[in-house]
């Protein structure tokens, strides 16, 4: 049995659900690989209070399945081609806003999570092809924007 090094393990974590930053008590999770409603439901089930960044190009799947996680959602930030449908999915159930870019989505979600004490989770339930070449590129954009957020005085 050969123990793996961090370098050997790390590539398998890219795009998976993981905490990429804790900023002033708000944790940011990248689950860009979740391209179906089922995957997003599974990811969010482990959280208590989530500001969910969700959307992209729907793969002709039933996005109403996402209502199952509504009790865990503080707010929804809908992005991409499916944003309009997602506002209908959560209408009257969870406050939902539409963001025109990932930057706008992350900045809004960060503010909402700071107020609520929740976590920000990118778990799109959709493909990335409306804005990106693939889910890795979408996840990388999310990470870059999260790390570009201004540090708060209490950040390490």
Regions flagged by a language model, labelled:
Residues 31, 52, 76, 122, ...:
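Residue-level signal for inorganic ion chemistry
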Residues 1-15, 20:
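Single conserved hydrophobic/aromatic residue that forms the stacking wall/gate
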Residues 125-151:
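Glycine/aspartate-rich loop-and-adjacent alpha/beta segment that forms the canonical ThDP
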